[in-house]
A protein has these predicted regions:
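Hydrolase catalytic cores
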Residues: 294, 412-478
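Subtilisin-like serine protease catalytic core
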Residues: 149, 215-300, 311-314, 325-328, ...
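Autoinhibitory N-terminal propeptides
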Residues: 1-223, 230-232
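C-terminal subdomain of the subtilisin-like protease fold in secreted/lumenal serine endopeptidases
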Residues: 280, 448-524, 542, 580-583, ...
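C-terminal edge strands of extracellular/lumenal beta-sandwich accessory domains
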Residues: 463-465, 516, 545, 554-558, ...
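Catalytic-core environment of secreted peptidases
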Residues: 235, 239-247, 385-437
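Substrate-binding/access-modulating region of protease and related hydrolase catalytic domains
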Residues: 146-152, 156, 171, 178, ...
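Short amphipathic, basic-aromatic surface patches that mediate peripheral association
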Residues: 525-545
Length: 681
């Protein structure tokens, strides 16, 4: 059959059947009857007793249809928007059983659709050309195959295997440029792309800005979520330490080089104890750390399948880049797959320091410049860079992701962060490199908060991420935006959601609907409701990263239905800078509805499985009630304040209609002195 390039003369009704590949849009013929009646195994390229096709359905197949295909000897693999899947056919599959399965088209994927745009166009990036002139590529293969067989077959074709990732189903290899298309044509190859660039590196006021001080207080009556018992993995520039702030809590370092103090600084932001200088205390000063180098090729990520179970790693922190708005790469796919497979794992990344750069999104300089495919993943966290007063650094990378999704995810302090460098001293550094470990440390604190409140059980990482995003302080434009993401992290509000169990969960198959109810009390300044799901990893071939699409609405006691916030992703500065508006979101794996001054009563959340090709899909509903009150968050009591030094006083206030004043007492409240008045919420 033929699967031609998109013809603009095709009727618009056909567009729902146009698979979206990175090198173009394919228009497959409706050929199922012809294929099933005339196919022959002698015409197929077999590998391990199988041949591989793309199957496109008229509608997303149900679980019963998928089971029928398995019984017939056909296994659906990665999803391709729209309504299509890679599929493995046993050489003796039962063609008759596929009749009536709602299959529109079956075809062999073209070599062009197996290549990244760079390889397709012959534009090999300099970083991917090795000294001998060969090209360093990543070769993706089908997930149901034996990695040893694939490696052997590639070596038989003359490839030099540099590294393999059996979990991610890809191989790092060297190939001559004139053999690229021949390798892509092999039946077991799904996709090829150049290796990503070598990784490049990209706190006292940070703790109070994030409100992490408020959940790890210095007085006995407060919260004490300091990350104790939580294990974080750091990938950076070399050996960490020596520094007394890490004493006994760096469990192992899987590297032998030391090329700077970038990693020391990031480690301190995560977990420094502040032993030499209390101002250098990290966010999760009770957490433990494993250390890997970031170069070459992020070895810590390759070790996750072992380290998650054997070492107990639950959070990773990586403040390194690998290309600018690189799209949904092999590494992005692997990150999403790891978080889906290991449900209490969360990867945290810096968004990047290319805020004024132009990375080809189409809107010119200043947009679409998040630095690296791994940060573009759906199930991970990418962090923007703020100063102490919630101002965005001009260097902080902006979204959207290549396909219009919201990035960065959230924001944290990354400018002039005071943290450890070796030996036993401290320094100020700036960048999203510093914001990333701040959020990794905050996540470690929230991880402990969940364990402490739920019988020692680990939280699902998707739930914790959703709580972090839904409780973030909205900055910039109303709602989410492409600069701050969902806002600046607020650990205090996140911990309160955990303690008060303001969340629910469910699971949906294709086309199903579920409802949840929320009882909203009086005197709420703002209601925030978010749905989040850890999405299935996308196929690297496609331009569209979202696989399972759920849709949420919120209905208030007066029966008014509210849609979630969404953003315009049209590639122009004016469009990308517009405030969020209410609408149906089909790109992101999270949606949020907010209502100011909500009426007291019962609200209904409806969730629809609009498109669930890799289901059933688990999701989380998180809700927050922001009260009409002023909450002091620093100082809280017990802090050691240095005479003569300036201190920032921080509070949270939303929906407070009247102004208020700030006073302090030096004699336990017997008398008060004015600091400021006429303050507004």
């Amino acid at each position: 059959m033929s699967a031609g390039r998109n013809n603009p003369l095709r009727p618009a009704s056909d567009r729902r059947f146009f698979p979206l590949f990175k090198t173009g849009v394919i228009v497959p013929e409706a050929n199922t009857e012809v294929f099933l009646s005339s196919w022959s195994s002698s015409n197929e390229s077999l590998f391990d007793g199988q041949f591989f096709k793309v199957i496109q359905f008229y509608e997303i197949p149900s679980g019963d249809v998928k089971n029928l295909l398995r019984e017939a000897g056909v296994t659906l693999l990665g999803y391709l928007p729209r309504n299509a899947y890679f599929a493995a056919f046993n050489q003796d599959f039962n063609a008759g059983m596929l009749t009536g399965a709602g299959i529109r088209s079956i075809w062999t994927i073209d070599v062009d659709c197996k290549l990244s745009p760079d390889l397709y166009e012959g534009n090999i990036p300099d970083h991917a050309i090795l000294e001998d002139g060969t090209v360093n590529v990543l070769v993706n293969y089908y997930s149901n195959l034996d990695p040893d067989q694939v490696v052997g077959a590639l070596q038989g074709q003359g490839l030099t295997v540099i590294q393999r990732d059996d979990f991610g189903h890809y191989i790092n290899a060297a190939v001559s440029q004139n053999e690229i298309r021949a390798i892509a044509a092999l039946p077991f190859v799904v996709f090829m792309e150049p290796v990503y660039p070598n990784p490049e590196p990209e706190n006292y006021t940070g703790r109070t800005l994030h409100r992490t001080n408020a959940i790890a207080t210095d007085h006995g009556a407060g919260r004490h979520y300091d990350g104790t018992g939580v294990i974080v993995e750091l990938q950076d520039d070399g050996i960490i330490g020596p520094h007394i702030d890490y004493q006994g809590r760096i469990l192992d370092q899987f590297l032998s080089n030391n090329s700077g103090n970038h990693g020391d600084h990031c480690a301190g932001i995560i977990m420094a104890a502040g032993n030499v200088d209390p101002l250098g205390k990290g966010n999760a000063f009770g957490a433990d750390l494993y250390v890997y180098g970031a170069s070459p090729n992020y070895p810590g990520f390759s070790a996750i399948p072992q380290d998650y179970g054997n070492l107990g790693v639950r959070i990773t922190s990586t403040s390194y880049s690998n290309g600018c708005n690189a799209g949904y790469t092999t590494l992005a796919q692997t990150m999403d797959q790891q978080v889906r497979t290991y449900p209490s794992l969360m990867h945290v990344f810096s968004a990047g320091n290319e805020g004024t750069g132009n990375c080809g999104y189409g809107a010119g300089a200043g947009w679409g410049n998040v630095t690296g495919g791994h940060k573009i993943g759906k199930n991970v966290i990418a962090v923007a860079n703020l100063d102490y007063a919630d101002n965005l650094a001009s260097s902080s990378s902006r979204g959207p992701a290549h396909d219009g999704r919201i990035k960065p995810d959230c924001a944290a302090k990354g400018s002039s962060v005071y943290s450890t460098i070796n030996p036993n001293t401290y320094a100020l550094k700036s960048g999203t490199s510093m914001a990333c470990p701040g959020v990794a440390g905050t996540m470690a604190q929230l991880f402990q908060a969940y364990r402490d409140n739920y019988a020692g059980n680990d939280p699902m990482a998707g739930l914790l991420k959703a709580i972090l995003l839904n409780t973030a302080e909205d900055l910039g434009n109303q709602g989410p935006d492409f600069k701050f993401g969902w806002g600046r992290v607020n650990a205090l509000r996140a911990a309160q959601v955990i303690e008060e169990a303001r969340f629910d969960s469910g699971s949906l198959a294709q086309g199903a609907t579920k409802t949840h109810t929320i009882a909203v009390p009086a005197n709420v300044a703002q209601l925030k409701v978010m749905i989040y799901w850890t999405d299935y990893e996308a196929s690297v071939n496609t331009t569209w990263a979202l696989v399972n699409n759920l849709d949420m609405t919120l209905t208030d006691p007066s029966s008014t239905t509210w849609l979630p916030w969404k953003l315009s992703h049209y590639p122009s500065p004016d469009s990308l800078n517009l405030p969020a508006f209410r609408g149906i979101d089909d790109r992101n794996n999270m949606e949020q509805v907010t209502l100011d001054a909500p009426a007291t009563g019962t609200y209904t959340v409806e969730v629809v499985g609009t498109s669930v090709p890799q289901g059933p899909q688990t999701y989380y509903i998180i809700y927050e009630f922001i009260p009409q009150e002023v909450v002091l968050t620093y100082p809280l009591g017990g802090e050691s304040l240095v005479p003569g030094e300036s201190e920032l006083i921080r509070w949270d206030a939303f929906g407070v209609s009247q102004t208020f004043k700030l006073e302090w007492s030096a004699n336990n409240g017997q008398s008060w002195e004015l600091i400021a008045e006429g303050l507004a919420g």
